[in-house]
């Protein structure tokens, strides 16, 4: 064990630290093809989704600034899509860190690290159910979870007839809409009649 742990830092920890940039930890673990794949996918992810993140998060926080150019509802939807895509990217980033650390542990224990072909066969053998159900999960996220998130987020805006595109923009109002259910007489009586 002394040969693999120098200066108190194990190979696994070094690989995990190097994996802050995806793929570098795999390259450090002598998994060149996997490292290049992770690095390439990460670079593609950043370039492909850079505009979505830029406009999406700007739109999610501001809901637009200029009439009639901005549509608050479209910006809200784009921002939620950016959040979902970011969560998928963070999950990939976690898998990258975990993979580098686990393979670094194998090197610390003087075990042989799997080649790309062996990793592929292990993925098919152990992760086949996840691999097969992942397209359905992605479809589920965008067809079920996204509309629910959109409806919840819309409830915290002042979107109504008087705050709709292209003439006006919606704004974030927090819990003000929910407060009005109990303070506006007609809304309160309707709410009480439905639940009372």
Where are these regions (language model features)?
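N-terminal signal-anchor/first transmembrane alpha helix
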Residues: 2-3, 12-14, 19-22, 28, ...
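Transmembrane helix-loop junctions in multipass membrane proteins, especially transporters and channels
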Residues: 54, 58, 104-111, 156-163
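Short membrane-interfacial helix/loop motifs at transmembrane-helix boundaries
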Residues: 60-66, 100, 143-185
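Hydrophobic side-chain positions on well-ordered alpha-helices
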Residues: 26-27, 181
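Transmembrane alpha-helix signature in integral membrane proteins
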Residues: 88-93, 183-196
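Juxtamembrane "helix exit" motif at the C-terminal ends of alpha-helical transmembrane segments
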Residues: 44-61
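Generic hydrophobic alpha-helical segments
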Residues: 23-24, 178
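Helix-boundary and loop/linker segments of multi-pass membrane transporters
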Residues: 8, 121-129, 180-186
């Amino acid at each position: 064990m002394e040969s693999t742990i120098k200066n108190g830092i194990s190979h696994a920890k070094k690989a995990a630290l190097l994996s802050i940039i995806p793929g570098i930890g795999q390259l450090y673990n002598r998994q060149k093809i996997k490292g290049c794949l992770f690095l390439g996918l990460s670079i593609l992810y950043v370039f492909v989704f850079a505009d979505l993140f830029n406009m999406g998060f700007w739109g999610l926080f501001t809901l637009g600034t200029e009439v009639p150019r901005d549509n608050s509802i479209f910006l809200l939807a784009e921002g939620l899509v950016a959040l979902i895509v970011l969560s998928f990217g963070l999950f990939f980033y976690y898998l990258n860190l975990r993979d580098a650390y686990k393979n670094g542990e194998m090197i610390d224990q003087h075990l042989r690290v799997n080649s790309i072909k062996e990793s592929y066969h292990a993925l098919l053998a152990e992760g086949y159910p996840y691999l097969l159900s992942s397209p359905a999960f992605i479809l589920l996220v965008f067809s079920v979870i996204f509309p629910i998130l959109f409806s919840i987020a819309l409830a915290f805006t002042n979107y109504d007839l008087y705050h709709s595109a292209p003439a006006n923009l919606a704004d974030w109002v927090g819990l003000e809409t929910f407060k009005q259910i109990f303070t506006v007489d007609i809304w309160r009586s309707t709410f009480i009649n439905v639940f009372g």
